[in-house]
From Swiss-Prot:
Function comment: Contributes to the regulation of the Wnt signaling pathway. Down-regulates CTNNB1-mediated transcriptional activation of target genes. May be involved in neuron differentiation.
Organism from which the protein derives: Xenopus laevis (African clawed frog)
Residue pairs linked by disulfide bridges in the UniProt entry: none
Protein name: Protein NDRG2
Location in the cell: Cytoplasm
Amino acid sequence: MSELHEVQITEDNPLLQDPLKAAELAAKLLQVQEQKHSIETPYGVVTVTIQGTPKPKRPAIVTFHDVGMDHKMCFDTLFKYEDMCEIVKNFVVCHIDAPGQEDGATIYPPGYQYPSLDQLAETIPCVLQYLNFPSIIGIGVGAGAYIFAKYTLSHANTVEGLVLINIDPNAKGWMDWAAQKLTGLTQSISDKMLGHLFSAEEISGNSDVVRQYKASISNSPLISNYQLYWNSYNSRRDLNFERGGGVTLKCPVMLVVGDQAPHEDAVVECNSKLDPTQTSFLKMADSGGQPQITQPGKMTEAFKYFVQGMGYMASSVMTRLSRSRTASLSSEGNRSRSRTLSQSSESGGGPPAPLAEVTC
């Protein structure tokens, strides 16, 4: 293993000089050519929202949300962040809502057989075929991260990269099942979902974001539909990742989790099972359980480095992360290409240093 390097990124020259104009531009970009489609799949109707237009020789950015929310609740904060406007300009963005989770969805009748996460993964080919997307960069959170990982195992040739936030690739064990049954006697479905979405510290502190999402979930007319997606997530199968084995993700992957988040241990374990030459691990301090909501600036910066490592947006300037936050970089083995959050040599003449793990 190579020695650790310390990286400091200044915030002296912000990426966009006028924050107000940048925010206005980002909002306009999100509104221009936004289209909604309802796509029939073998496992129900999937609603997708398209922002922008397909770019030649560039993958589409496709998102899949977590339980207890739709794509707006999960990704609006990130994609409306001022610095994300540059990404929106360079890629078409497609947000997938799981069946029955979108705003205004029909409420399923009692006894409705909701698709499993494996089946939801098989709705993605229908979406890509309908929209004529030959390849994608997937961004998934929680259940959505699992769905993208499962999809990629079967359709690796269509996936150029993955950003997996709060992924738990393991099936629930007997202890988890027993604990869930016990908490089910005293906790409402909204409280159980909050425990999945946010850290214990955020919940005990009753932060603004927790209050907002608790009210949104509790008061939603779709709460019974949310529970179906929740049940499918808790019935997920083990993805059986194995480092050096046949079951692994072969594309560039960025794993993201908040420090002290409910899924921190699961993401750390997932990182230990994936190919270190293809995987980067970003642990975010002060971000809680939903880093794409609480730290959109960090997420934007990390994602831009990620797509730069894949050969896109090479001219984009990275200046958002503060000097007060240092990134400790380590590498296991040589990489075939520069990877996310990498730093070029001080002289500017050397190649970017690869990264396996970052804490910021």
